[in-house]
Structures are given as structure tokens and as C-alpha cells.
């Protein structure tokens, strides 16, 4: 698929306070269009990954609001208009009202989401 928009993305994921439109692109990358409806620290969802942190590298752009990522020794905050790269080893923190676009390697995204979904099934939120 050579291009995608929020409206044309083939997958939709909704969880408490989060809506994601997702498309797997050619070249081994996926794009996520995210709307954060509520504040949320997602720490419990990454239990079982290395250091119980997200191991997904992310390249993103903040369309509206802000998003942040907690590392073992610091926190990074990105606000409207910021482009960013976040390496593996973080915890995403959602801020209500934020809208972001992120790109990640499809294979790593799939493996990470497998762990996240198992944790959700076990009652993590």
C-alpha cells in the first residue's frame, strides 16, 4: 500500500481512553493514527517484555496536545508540532486530548502487541 490516512487505515483498535487506526505498510513498517481520550500510564500492559518496558522503537509526530515516555532514568515529553524518535525501553504515557501519528517496524509491533493483548486479557489496564 503506497499511502494511508486515518480514514483509510484498515484496522481499528479501541481500548479504554484510546483509539488507534493502524495500517501495515510496504517496507516492513506500520503507521498508527492515535487519539488519546484520557490520561493513562500504560506500565501494566508491558509486563513480560524486557525490563517490563515497551521494546518498540517509535518515530512520531504530535498533531495535538502532548505525549510522553518514561525511561528508567528520565522522561521525555513531546508537544504539538514535535517530531520524535523513541528507542526501545520506555513506558508510553497518554495525555487526554492528544492526537499523534507513529511509525514502527511491523514485526516488532506485532510481537509487542501480542504481549500487550495477553496482559489486557489478564485484566491489566
Task: Explain the meaning of each model-derived region.
Residues 4, 20-22, 33, 59, ...:
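Conserved hydrophobic/aromatic beta-strand scaffold that supports enzyme active sites
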Residues 10, 45-53, 119:
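Vicinal oxygen chelate
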Residues 14-50:
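A short glycine-rich, His/Asp/Glu-containing loop-to-beta-strand
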Residues 26-27, 70-74, 95-97:
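Short strand-coil-strand connectors
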Residues 51-69:
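Short, conserved beta-strand element in jelly-roll/cupin
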Residues 71-90:
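Short acidic-glycine-tyrosine-enriched beta hairpin
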Residues 88-113:
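Ligand-binding loop in jelly-roll beta-barrel domains
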Residues 114-125:
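Glycine- and charge-enriched low-complexity intrinsically disordered segments
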Amino acid at each position: 500500500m503506497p499511502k494511508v490516512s486515518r480514514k483509510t487505515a484498515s484496522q481499528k483498535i479501541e481500548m479504554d481512553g484510546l483509539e488507534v487506526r493502524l495500517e501495515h505498510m510496504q517496507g516492513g513498517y506500520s503507521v498508527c493514527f492515535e487519539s488519546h481520550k484520557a490520561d493513562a500510564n500504560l506500565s501494566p500492559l508491558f509486563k513480560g517484555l524486557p525490563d517490563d518496558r515497551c521494546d518498540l522503537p517509535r518515530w512520531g509526530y504530535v498533531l495535538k496536545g502532548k505525549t510522553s515516555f518514561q525511561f528508567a532514568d528520565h522522561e521525555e515529553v513531546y508537544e504539538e508540532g514535535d517530531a520524535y524518535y523513541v528507542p526501545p525501553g520506555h513506558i508510553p504515557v497518554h495525555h487526554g486530548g492528544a492526537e499523534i501519528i507513529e511509525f514502527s517496524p511491523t514485526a516488532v509491533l506485532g510481537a509487542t502487541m501480542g504481549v500487550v493483548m495477553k496482559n489486557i486479557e489478564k485484566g491489566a489496564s
